[in-house]
Amino acid sequence: MDILFYKVFRNLYIKNIIFKILRLYKNYSKKYNVFKNVEQYKLFKDKEYLVKMEWDMNIEIPINLIPDNTIKYLKFGKYFNQPIKSLPIGVELIDLKYSLNFNQNQFQIPITLKTLILNRDFNQNFTKLSNNNNDDDNNNLSLNKVENISFGRDYDCLIDETIFSKSITSIKLSDSFCQELDDRTLPKTLTFLEFGWTFNGYLKIGDLDGLSKLRVLKFGVSFNTEIQCNVLPNSIEKITFGSSFNQVILPNSLPRNLRILKFGSSFNQPIFPPPSSLSSESLPNLLKLKFDSSFNQPILPSSLSNSITRLEFRSTHFNQQLSISSLPKNLKYLGIFINNYSTIIEDNDNNNNSEFLKIINILN
């Protein structure tokens, strides 16, 4: 096998063809190629190498125009307002974000589809979609291969876990979504959940029950509601709070398996010693912690989990003194701004300056 490979690869003609094909695939994978009329696509000479394509016209895609197993990422332009019924097999992502309309009754998904991005104006009760393989059994299944779905800007309708397939792992809710959640709202297979801009709902015990596979949780800009104990699944490893969040972190309100925690620009709450929710007792697995632009609170000994290896203070006016004794024992990276440098480390008898200086990094 190796001998055959070297014989083929040493043939300059074949070698040049291989590299040409690789270059074409690489070039057409970087950005979307925009087509504004059907004739432009027909005349395009490298169709078989296209990976990303934007259909920027208000014309239904003709049947069999696009060969199967070529396009993987298909985006529809802002003028598109037609039924979607003849998409090729092989499409893994459909982006309708900027299209004029989405009629779920005139949309058949390719059986290979993994990611669906809905358009901004879509705000109808989301029902079951069918695929385009004309199989009656499969036509009764909703999004039977889709793993990721992103709702458009205006979507604010009730959702139910039964509309999603068993393969769904990621949901991004719309900026307008403000519906109450319960244990039947979201599919149990989720590993990623992102709330939109306006969501500020009170999460109750049981609302997220069953999401035992959830790993990443992102809150939107407006979220500023206190997190109660036993509400968030312990499976969560990363939480990002939006810019409005400024609530006291109650003991045991954050998942014990949390590894990454990022606060937004408004957060400026005291960080208490144990049983504080940021201490080793509550978050024994926390590795990365980031405070943002408003934070300016003292860091007391044992108030932060000793498991933390990376700690950032991204506030230009953070001026609390820090010492080795107040920082996590496993800390390898401490990020601060240059204008706070002298204030933070000056004249502290508890500081072992040689150790302290090794971990300090100046943020841009």
UniProtKB/Swiss-Prot annotation:
The keyword Repeat applies. InterPro entries: FNIP (IPR008615), STK_FNIP-Repeat (IPR051251). FNIP repeats lie at residues 57-98, 155-198, 214-244, 245-271, 295-340. Keywords: Repeat. The keyword Repeat applies. It holds the Pfam family FNIP. PANTHER family: FNIP REPEAT-CONTAINING PROTEIN (PTHR32134), FNIP REPEAT-CONTAINING PROTEIN-RELATED (PTHR32134:SF169). This is FNIP repeat-containing protein DDB_G0277323. It comes from Dictyostelium discoideum (Social amoeba). The lineage of its organism: Eukaryota, Amoebozoa, Evosea, Eumycetozoa, Dictyostelia.
